[in-house]
Amino acid sequence: MLEAAILYTLPLAVISFFCGLLIAVIVAVIRTLPSPNLPLKLLQALCRVYISIIRGTPMLVQIFIIFYGLPEVGITLEPFPTAIIAFSINIGAYAAETVRASIIAIPKGQWEASYAIGMNYRQAFIRTIMPQALRISVPSLSNTFISTVKDTSLASLVLVTELFRVAQNITAANYEFILIYSEAALIYWIFCFVLSFLQDRLEIRLSRHL
């Protein structure tokens, strides 16, 4: 089971998280842009709808729609990329609100100081605002990643041979449910414990620079 956790569970969580984070940053940036024109307003409305739908529906339903629904329109994916897409879309919706809140939390004086030294909006955002916003969002994003590690067990329902799927296969053969599932739970806990420790260290290190 440890091999499955290393080869499938962790890569699934890591790839999904960073793809989701990319989606989150794009959505958050769009939602925080000034909206003087109709196309941008429509794009912002679309982002709000995306967040509302994803946050308002179970992840399992989202996984099933992608895995079983896409083949109906001629798109067939393997289980692993299906899980990555589903997790990334889900993470993107939740993390987008985290990143957006962090951007809004940056004092307006930071914008004004950037403009005062000759930066335009894009330069101020990339060089001054976004680094601080990501630093502020580290605790919430770290918790999202830890939750993603645990949520990868849902991928077993679309036949991804990650940790929980392997545990199911073993129990189907020997019926040692308590032993096998306890071992799986222990592996999940060890991963999350290590990640929580690293999160604490990272927060302490970042706090020195705030």
From Swiss-Prot:
Any one of the GO BP annotations: L-cystine transport
Recorded topology in the membrane: Multi-pass membrane protein
Entries under Pfam families matching the protein: BPD_transp_1 (PF00528)
Transmembrane segments: 10-30, 57-77, 79-99, 177-197
GO molecular function: L-cystine transmembrane transporter activity
InterPro entries linked to this entry: AA_ABC_transptr_permease_3TM, ArtM/GltK/GlnP/TcyL/YhdX-like, MetI-like, MetI-like_sf
Cellular component aspect of the GO annotation: ATP-binding cassette (ABC) transporter complex; plasma membrane
Record key words, sorted: Amino-acid transport, Cell inner membrane, Cell membrane, Membrane, Transmembrane, Transmembrane helix, Transport
Compartments where located: Cell inner membrane
Domain ABC transmembrane type-1 per the UniProt entry, residue ranges: 6-199
Chief subcellular location: membrane
Superkingdom as given in the UniProt entry: Bacteria
Function noted in UniProt: Probably part of a binding-protein-dependent transport system for an amino acid. Probably responsible for the translocation of the substrate across the membrane.
NCBIfam families xrefs: HEQRo_perm_3TM
PANTHER family the record matches: L-CYSTINE TRANSPORT SYSTEM PERMEASE PROTEIN TCYL, MEMBRANE COMPONENT OF AMINO ACID ABC TRANSPORTER
Family: Belongs to the binding-protein-dependent transport system permease family. HisMQ subfamily.
Protein name, UniProt field: Probable amino-acid ABC transporter permease protein HI_0179
Organism, as annotated: Haemophilus influenzae (strain ATCC 51907 / DSM 11121 / KW20 / Rd)
